Amino acid sequence: VTDTSIGPLQIGESVADASFLSVLELRGLDPRWEADGVSPITLTEATTVLALTWSDGVVMAGDRRATAGNYIAHSRVRKVYEADRHSAVAISGTAGMAVELIKLFRTELEHYEKIEGSTLSLDGKANFLARMIRGNLSMAFQGLVVIPLFCGYDKRQEKGRLFSYDVVGGRYDELNFATTGSGGAEARSFLKSVWNEDLTREQALGAAVEAIVAAAEEDSATGGLDLKRGILPNVLVVTADGVEEISDEDLAAIAQPILDGRP
């Protein structure tokens, strides 16, 4: 059955800008999360994610645990995603909504590139993600919160950059490192103790993995490392060459001496 009430965009039809969301809004198809009234439901939540700069880019990492109240709902949740060729995004908060928001964000970046023939600047990407978080404000007031981290390689400034956000869509440039989620304070404290501007790739990867371990030791909602079962953080490295995902084999090699050295 074909629905003829909503047809394709016609040639010459006005669109506000080269935004996929604007196209959806024009057709009345934009995603809307609404909850009239508050009911006592238990939601699956993603927990600790982090990012830190190093000499040639940014490392972004996230643990794999998702919780529903005091219950461990999942032990292999992916929280760090490639946004496009030179940026990545990590999620914390209400897991289902966060994953959908990131899918839409990635589609938005792809749509913009197809329409404009060029990519958004890194600041433009960060600003658009802030706009999307702000669009979720009514749900945030009812406890359905999504707070991501965003990072990328800025070709104009020739360095890695990272951004944090608050629940109302405020965007903040972070110079060295950023964390969010239930174990964010512990991870941040560890990164503060080890970060320096001359970190190598290997040192940054080690710091990211050990920060997850430190957070898991203090926060029950953060999943630690389990080499026997193959449960390891998912980690991305962003440089001028693009986004690289670190394999479980490489992460295990990084993690083993860290775990051996913990008291």
What positions do the PLM features span?
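Long, low-complexity N-terminal extensions
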Residues: V1-P263
